[in-house]
UniProtKB/Swiss-Prot annotation:
It comes from Xanthomonas oryzae pv. oryzae (strain KACC10331 / KXO85). This is Undecaprenyl-diphosphatase. The keyword Nucleotidyltransferase does not apply. InterPro entries: UppP. Catalyzes the dephosphorylation of undecaprenyl diphosphate (UPP). Confers resistance to bacitracin. Pfam families: BacA. It is a multi-pass membrane protein. The chain crosses the membrane at residues 38-58, 75-95, 108-128, 135-155, 181-201, 215-235, 244-264. Bacitracin is thought to be involved in the inhibition of peptidoglycan synthesis by sequestering undecaprenyl diphosphate, thereby reducing the pool of lipid carrier available. The keyword Phosphoprotein does not apply. It is found in: Cell inner membrane. HAMAP family: Undec_diphosphatase.
Length: 265
């Protein structure tokens, strides 16, 4: 398989999995077993494509918030998004400096996929018994910020899965409202994470040699696919539960745990 086709597939995979509650990190690690491992810079660029995708998909919502800060509800919402991001940034930096992160290898990812799928089924069942609410509380904002850190510590957890369901359990029980808030918090979080990673790479001597055609193709693929996925998901969860994603995670995690010993042998 050519490097260009491999880059295209990895870009599509990033766009497909970044915003679905199934773990983009886990899927990229799995794909790299067959498509080859790419540089950290390549992975940052395709995530940048996902960032652009969500900004485009939510552009109307972002514009409404930006131009409506004179309204109390909009100011309150933006402030809670900011607090959630700051919690992630501060706690995440402490965790990173302390070195608290599992290695990005297939076995912990497989367990995270499996356990995360079970967690999703249980969490949505419990949240389904709560009164339907779409108001973001301070408790939800802080918890979402912490949940993003947890997702960073345990590769394969999925940022969207951990944050959406903790928000639902703590009172933001309407699925679409929880996803909307989580995606809003995800925008500055992903920007900051990518910027920090680029800065660290620069300090370590630069970005190395890249095939820029591969990088460009992957970026565009991640952007287009991510845009479609965000639009589809926000429409889908208005009428459907997350069950299909939970079952998919359980099946994939179990399959990986069965495959790994055979592959090692």
């Amino acid at each position: 398989m050519s490097d260009l086709i491999s880059a295209l597939l990895l870009g599509i995979l990033e766009g497909l999995t970044e915003f679905l509650p199934i773990s983009s990190t886990g899927h990229l690690l799995i794909a790299e077993q067959w498509l080859g491992r790419r540089s950290d810079f390549f992975n940052i660029v395709i995530q940048a494509g996902a960032i652009l995708a969500i900004c485009l998909a939510l552009r109307q919502r972002l514009w409404t918030l930006a131009t409506g800060l004179g309204e109390r509800d909009n100011r309150d919402y933006v402030l809670k998004v900011s607090v959630a991001f700051l919690v992630t940034a501060v706690v995440g930096l402490i965790v990173r400096k302390a070195g608290w992160q599992l290695p990005e290898t297939l076995q912990p990812v497989a367990w995270a996929l499996l356990i995360g799928g079970v967690w999703m089924l249980v969490a949505e069942h419990v949240a389904g018994k709560l009164p339907e609410r779409d108001v973001v509380t301070w408790k939800v904002a802080i918890a979402v910020g912490l949940a993003q850190v947890v997702a960073g510590v345990f590769p394969g957890t999925s940022r969207s899965a951990s944050t959406i369901f903790i928000a639902m359990l703590l009172g933001l029980s309407r699925r679409s409202a929880a996803a909307d808030f989580v995606f809003m918090v995800g925008i500055p979080t992903m920007f900051a994470a990518s910027g920090y990673a680029l800065l660290e790479m620069y300090k370590e001597g630069g970005f190395g040699t890249e095939h820029w055609a591969d990088v460009a193709v992957a970026f565009v693929a991640a952007t287009i696919t991510g845009f479609v996925v965000v639009k589809w998901l926000l429409s889908y969860i208005k009428k459907h539960r997350f069950t299909v994603f939970a079952v998919y995670r359980i099946v994939l995690g179990a399959a990986l745990l069965l495959w790994l010993p055979a592959a090692a042998g």
